[in-house]
A protein has these predicted regions:
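Detector for outer-membrane/organellar transmembrane beta-barrel domains
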Residues: 161-246, 251, 306
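Outer-membrane pore/translocation modules
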Residues: 87-89, 93-199
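Outer-membrane beta-barrel "beta-signal"
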Residues: 260, 291-307
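Structural signature of outer-membrane beta-barrel channels/translocons
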Residues: 67-73, 114-120, 173-177, 209-213, ...
């Protein structure tokens, strides 16, 4: 009887300890914070480069956005950046041709929605969506260099061109050990950033990132090709090809750089970008207000905080 009683007590003790362990484990799991479906980010960069073309005339930019991702895979988001290329197009020369619309604002506002899910396996998320680039302005005066506008003031288009753009996109993410990245295809269903007759432009690109496993450093590489149909006839084209002329606005771009994870949602990046954007005569297809190459090689540094 004593032996049986001892065994019963031991069994009870084991059950009690097991129960306490389970409760402790449950409490630990319950204490783990839930992953929020809402994230935010803010970036300070030495320049805003998009598809190899400067959007801030090689000057600093501040950027930020919000994202909501549902567990089903659907998501929506907004991203914004300071820019100068719209106001630069008006300020290229002196009055009277520089007068920008009073409702213009030095900002780009992007709105997007889509569906992202690992449809073909872990680490291989497929992504489909629509992206609206919105620029608060009553009209774009053309992306013309100061030299050309000075020589052809009567041909300058000072309003009426809408730079806002709508794109559809499809992307396939991949993971191969320490290498991650994605291939993406973007298609413009509207004119592309104010370029006339450019609906149907598309941009295939490939991005790859290699986690070195040292000091939180990742190597980043990117290549893309901006195709613009019809050699786009624009007021800008007149600059290098004569009245009624055309030029080739298509080009390739690339980027190579490093990203450093500092922890706590803080990261820094440094990279170099370049393009094959063409020159027509003495005029660049994508020109800065003073006639420089907006697609020239650029070194950029940035600091990003995610929340």
């Amino acid at each position: 009887m004593k032996a049986l009683q001892k065994t019963a007590i031991s069994a009870a003790a084991v059950a009690l300890l097991t129960g306490l362990t389970s409760v402790a484990a449950f409490a630990e799991e319950a204490a783990a914070p839930e992953v929020s479906p809402v994230t935010a980010n803010v970036t300070v960069a030495s320049s805003y480069i998009y598809r190899g073309i400067t959007q801030s005339n090689n000057k600093p930019a501040i950027q930020g956005g919000f994202d909501y991702a549902h567990e089903s895979g659907f998501y929506v988001g907004n991203w914004n950046s300071s820019i100068s290329w719209i106001s630069d197009s008006y300020n290229a020369v002196s009055t009277p041709v520089k007068s920008a619309p009073s409702t213009s604002a030095p900002i780009e506002m992007d709105f997007y929605a889509g569906f992202k899910k690992e449809l073909i396996g872990e680490g291989f998320a497929s992504d489909f969506g629509v992206l609206q680039y919105y620029y608060p302005t009553t009209g774009l005066g053309g992306i013309q260099s100061k030299a050309w506008v000075t020589a052809n003031p009567s041909l300058r288009q000072t309003s009426g061109v809408n730079p806002s753009t709508t794109e559809l996109y499809a992307a396939q993410n991949f993971t191969f050990g320490a290498v991650t990245g994605f291939g993406k295809f973007s298609y413009a269903v509207s004119n592309l950033f104010g370029l006339q007759n450019s609906a149907g432009s598309f941009y295939p690109d490939l991005t790859a990132n290699y986690d070195t496993g040292m000091y939180g450093i990742t190597v980043n590489a990117h290549v893309g090709y901006q195709y613009v149909p019809n050699n786009v006839v624009t007021t800008v084209a007149l600059a290098g090809a004569g009245n009624g002329g055309t030029w080739n606005a298509s080009y390739a771009d690339w980027k190579l750089g490093l990203t450093k994870d500092f922890g706590g949602g803080l990261s820094g990046s440094a990279y170099y970008t370049g393009t094959s954007a063409q020159k027509v005569g003495s005029t660049y297809v994508y020109a800065t207000p003073n006639g420089g190459n907006a697609g020239r090689g650029n070194a950029v540094v940035a600091l990003t905080k995610t929340f």
